[in-house]
Amino acid sequence: MKTFSQKPAEVTKKWVLIDAEGLVVGRLATIVANRLRGKHKPTFTPHVDDGDNVIIINADKVVFTGKKYQDKTYYWHTGYAGGIKERTARQILEGRFPERVVEKAVERMIPRGPLGRRQMKNLRVYAGSEHPHSAQNPEKVDIAALNKKNARG
């Protein structure tokens, strides 16, 4: 029996809607990263964008376990000498773009490279409960029901 290899023309993508309210960030991100890569499908092929389109709503209502809400620090560099910057998870979630916490968690679980960048374009994250993709008829996935550790509160 030959090893199956998915061809890009044969890929079928679904639209998936996930409500992130009360979900643990890391557990949500691993499930979303696997969906974006297509690892949940039997047709998974490492070099083909076989994943689904994922919509995440209520990204501002995700939770951290332990003291990570106050203590977890995100770092980035401006490119200038001495230009290291840092913010805590709390500052980002209470700031202008709280959806970046979920975006960065998923982005850092996807392989870096051209295929990873293409797969990240299939992710849409919204801080509120509204999204403009109702025409795609996304299938709702209940992450909290998969495992009791996935949700808090």
From Swiss-Prot:
Any one GO molecular function term: structural constituent of ribosome
Biological processes annotated in GO: negative regulation of translation; translation
Superkingdom: Bacteria
CDD domains for the chain: Ribosomal_L13 (cd00392)
Sorted UniProt keywords: Ribonucleoprotein, Ribosomal protein
InterPro entries: Ribosomal_uL13, Ribosomal_uL13_bac-type, Ribosomal_uL13_sf
Gene Ontology CC annotations of this record: cytosolic large ribosomal subunit
SUPFAM superfamilies cross-referenced by the UniProt entry: Ribosomal protein L13
Pfam families: Ribosomal_L13
Family to which the UniProt record says this protein belongs: Belongs to the universal ribosomal protein uL13 family.
Function: This protein is one of the early assembly proteins of the 50S ribosomal subunit, although it is not seen to bind rRNA by itself. It is important during the early stages of 50S assembly.
Subunit structure, as described in the record: Part of the 50S ribosomal subunit.
Annotated protein name in UniProt: Large ribosomal subunit protein uL13
Species of provenance: Chelativorans sp. (strain BNC1)
